[in-house]
Amino acid sequence: MDPNMNNLLKWSIENSTSARQAGNSNGTGPAPASRSNLNPEMLSALFGGPSDADLMKAAMEALHSDEVDLENKMIAFDNFEQLIESIDNANNLEPLGLWTPLVELLKHEEAEMRRMAAWCIGTAVQNNEKAQDKLIVFNVLPTLVAMSTSDPAPAARKKAVYAISSGVRNYQPAMDEFVKHLPEGYTSGEKIDAADMEAIDALLDKLRAHPSEVSA
């Protein structure tokens, strides 16, 4: 990671933490010390950018770094998720080479990392046909289906269902791919229309209510 981007990420994390602490103080106690240790290069990066693309790449590097602890990875994930709420940023995931490292995090040993990865995928593909197609291009749906039916962490399963829900609605290719990878018993083999919200809701409710025995 570029040193200035690394320092900027640390600054962002520190100030995110300070903001949370200040919000939790209810106006009592001393305010957190301000952090003004930004060097000129960092200030230039901050006020001349960095671009959203730079921030997205820095967050992903932090998420894959062994030197960043879980708490700060959660902050990086939260920042990343907020960035890709923008359709333009979500569509920039592929040019930036970020889809593959994001999908890899669905198989992370930490349940919170899997949960956040699924959450980010769900955010990226929601009402975004171009991003929905990436679920097929990067073979994401089999992993999301496996998570939704067998992940030992209920919160991770829930976010996997959310990602599936966002990915298949009104996009038939993803809907067909999703159904193809479902375990037996979830459908009767009939084709489900990606525009049929009631049918999709009923199928997703089955996923929520009946995780496989592996997750029991």
From Swiss-Prot:
The gene is fes1. It comes from Aspergillus fumigatus (strain ATCC MYA-4609 / CBS 101355 / FGSC A1100 / Af293) (Neosartorya fumigata). Belongs to the FES1 family. One of its GO terms (cellular component) is cytosol. One of its GO terms (molecular function) is adenyl-nucleotide exchange factor activity. This is Hsp70 nucleotide exchange factor fes1. Keywords: Cytoplasm, Repeat, Translation regulation. Its main location: cytoplasm. Functions as a nucleotide exchange factor (NEF) for Hsp70 chaperones which accelerates the release of ADP. Required for fully efficient Hsp70-mediated folding of proteins. Pfam families: Fes1 (PF08609), HEAT_EZ (PF13513). It is found in: Cytoplasm.
